[in-house]
C-alpha cells in the first residue's frame, strides 16, 4: 500500500471562528429567501451545534413573495409603501421566527442552556420578543434593522454582538476560491 503524506497543521492555520462559521450558515440560509424586499437568514446554535435555520419568506403552501404572494412587498417594490411601514400586512415570516418555529416543529428546546441566535440582520421587535421568550442568551448579527428595540433586548439581559461584515465576506470568498 502506498504511504500517504501527512499534512501537519500548525497554530497559524486559518479558519473561521465559531461566530464567523455560524454567520456563514445564516448567509447561506438567506439564499433561500423568497422575499422581494429583504433577504435574511438565521441560525439557532447551542454548544457549537446548529439546532435550526430559517430564512424570510411566505409560509409553506403560499405563493412565493417574488411570485406575487405578498401584496405588501409588491407595494414596497413599487414605491407605494416605505421601508418599515405596514409590516403587519406582510405575509413573509421573518428568518428568526422561522428558525424558532422549526425548533418547535422538531421538538427542540432552543432557548435553554445559552443558545445563540445568529442573524444576517438584527431581529425586529417581534422576533426579538420571541427570542427573549424562548430564552436566547445572545444575538449575533451583521447588519442593523430599523424596527429593533435595543432597550428591550438589554433589559432582558440578552447580549448583542455585531460581526465584521468584511470578515464574513473574506470567508465567503475563501470558500469560493475567489
Regions found by a protein language model. Name each.
Residues 1-178:
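Zinc-dependent deaminase catalytic domain
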Amino acid at each position: 500500500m502506498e504511504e500517504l503524506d501527512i499534512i501537519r497543521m500548525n497554530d497559524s492555520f486559518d479558519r473561521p471562528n465559531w461566530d464567523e462559521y455560524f454567520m456563514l450558515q445564516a448567509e447561506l440560509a438567506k439564499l433561500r429567501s423568497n422575499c422581494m424586499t429583504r433577504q435574511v437568514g438565521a441560525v439557532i446554535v447551542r454548544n457549537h451545534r446548529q439546532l435550526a435555520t430559517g430564512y424570510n419568506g411566505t409560509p409553506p403552501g403560499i405563493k412565493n413573495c417574488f411570485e406575487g404572494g405578498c401584496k405588501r412587498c409588491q407595494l414596497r417594490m413599487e414605491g407605494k409603501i416605505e421601508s418599515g411601514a405596514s409590516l403587519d400586512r406582510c405575509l413573509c415570516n421573518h428568518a428568526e421566527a422561522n428558525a424558532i418555529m422549526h425548533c418547535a416543529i422538531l421538538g427542540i428546546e432552543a432557548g435553554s442552556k445559552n443558545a445563540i441566535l445568529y442573524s444576517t440582520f438584527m431581529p425586529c421587535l417581534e422576533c426579538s420578543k420571541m427570542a427573549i421568550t424562548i430564552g436566547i442568551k445572545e444575538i449575533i448579527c451583521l447588519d442593523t434593522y430599523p424596527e429593533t428595540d435595543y432597550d428591550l433586548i438589554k433589559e432582558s439581559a440578552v447580549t448583542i454582538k455585531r460581526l465584521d461584515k468584511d470578515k464574513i465576506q473574506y470567508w465567503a470568498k475563501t470558500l469560493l476560491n475567489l
